[in-house]
Design a protein with these regions (language model features):
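Active-site core of metal-dependent hydrolases
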Residues: 165-266, 270-287
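Divalent-metal coordination cores built from histidine and acidic residues
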Residues: 82-167
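Divalent metal-coordination and catalytic microenvironments
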Residues: 16, 36, 56, 67, ...
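Hydrophobic faces of well-ordered beta-strands that scaffold small-molecule active sites
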Residues: 64-68, 92-94, 118-122, 159-163, ...
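A conserved glycine-rich beta-strand in the N-terminal activation segment of trypsin-fold
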Residues: 24-33
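His/Asp/Glu-enriched, well-ordered alpha-helical/loop segment
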Residues: 261-343
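C-terminal cap of metal-dependent C-N hydrolases
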Residues: 335-370
Length: 370
């Protein structure tokens, strides 16, 4: 790779491979940057001896993690944003780390000062993820009007309303009432829902999905238990119907929400996740578990998802979902967020959250310039 500084605000970056899912560009190339925005993307005939990166390295639009936990002091699940940036992720979307009662502090102490771009799926629970108890343990933590007001105060920082109806999040409250309240907030504010499913013995998955709207996002889509979108190797009809209606599906790997068998069955059936995300949280840090977005991308490749679909699921698609049209692309006018990915020379052992194994080459990433 060659980085040329043409002036105070002008840079040219050349690499053996530059890839942009939006434009279809995949070639030797040069990215021209003016005032932190891309001014041009052009092909080169061949690599040169001055290209410093190995052959396996290439440049993508800055990758976007649609579901993670950001902010090491503001949420019990939150991770230092510096850790996220080091893996090459340039946009981190917090899943419910702040609610109406905590969003002002979260914006000031995380979003405003983080070294990468952070957007929030505001928690329907006013306390966010600030307690070891489930965020919907008490009914008084659900305040539709307060949530709407918080979104209005921080419209530029909020991309969705987070409604996690899992048994852990709401052990006593009726999950139907939670989703109803979340949908009211979403309708009033024009935002999508980021939805965590309830176990089917409490509420059928078909009935849950039927309430979601086009543009709403279901996370933890490749979990095996207590809910699963696959049965006997086939994707459930209610899940396929939801996708036809425009409901979106996100990986949300986490500490217990990614199963190779489920993912492999879904991919084999042509059911690809719309977005790939880590659900990175303190459990990964405290247990010294290597976990980042390029690694989760590698796991999707190991179950048969094609590279271009993977790259799109961490750039173009999440940028659209969070309403950031100048991100996730290398087209002229886009913000100059860039990620460098490098591929391992040989296959490595990959593990899902249930201890199952697959083998595959692994991507590692860094932000360009880091």
């Amino acid at each position: 790779m060659v980085v040329g500084f043409l002036g105070t605000n002008s840079i040219q970056i050349s690499s053996k491979r530059i890839l942009c899912p939006v434009s279809g560009f995949d070639s030797y190339g040069t990215i021209s940057i003016e005032d932190n925005h891309i001014s041009a993307l052009s092909k080169r005939e061949a690599a040169t001896s001055s290209d410093a990166l190995p052959d396996s390295a290439f440049v993508l639009p800055g990758i976007i993690d649609l579901h993670c936990h950001v902010g090491s002091h503001q949420s019990i699940y939150g991770v230092d944003p510096v850790r996220i940036l080091k893996s090459g992720t340039t946009v981190a979307c917090s899943q419910g780390d702040a609610g109406a009662a905590t969003i002002d502090q979260y914006v000031a102490e995380v979003i405003a000062v983080a070294p990468l771009y952070v957007k929030l799926a505001i928690n329907l629970s006013s306390i966010g993820e600030s307690t070891e108890e489930g965020c919907f343990s008490l009914s008084e933590w659900i305040d539709v009007a307060a949530c709407i007001d918080a979104i209005d105060r921080h419209r530029d920082s909020v991309w969705a309303v987070s409604v996690n109806t899992s048994h852990h999040a709401c052990p006593e409250l009726d999950p139907r009432s939670l989703l109803k309240a979340g949908l009211k907030v979403a309708a009033e504010t024009g935002l999508p829902i980021l939805y965590g499913m309830r176990r089917p013995e409490d509420w059928s998955l078909a009935d849950q999905l039927a309430l979601l709207r086009p543009g709403d996002v279901v996370t933890y889509c490749f979990r095996k238990t207590p809910h699963c979108i696959v049965e006997n190797g086939r994707v459930l009809e209610c899940v396929l119907d939801a996708r036809v209606r425009g409901v979106l599906f996100d990986v949300g790997h986490g500490c217990g929400s990614f199963d190779f068998d489920v993912a492999e069955s879904a991919v084999r059936c042509g059911f690809l996740p719309d977005t790939i995300s880590t659900d990175l949280q303190t459990g990964h840090v405290t247990n010294n578990i290597l976990h980042d977005l390029p690694l989760v991308m590698s796991k999707l490749r190991a179950v048969g998802m094609q590279e271009l679909d993977i790259f799109r699921a961490v750039t173009e698609t999440p940028a659209k979902i969070i309403n950031e049209p100048k991100r996730g692309s290398l087209c002229a006018g886009s913000i100059a967020d860039l990620t460098v990915l490098m591929e391992s020379e040989s296959a490595c052992q990959l593990t899902d959250t249930n201890g199952n194994m697959r083998c595959g080459k692994v991507w590692t990433g860094r932000q360009l310039g880091s």
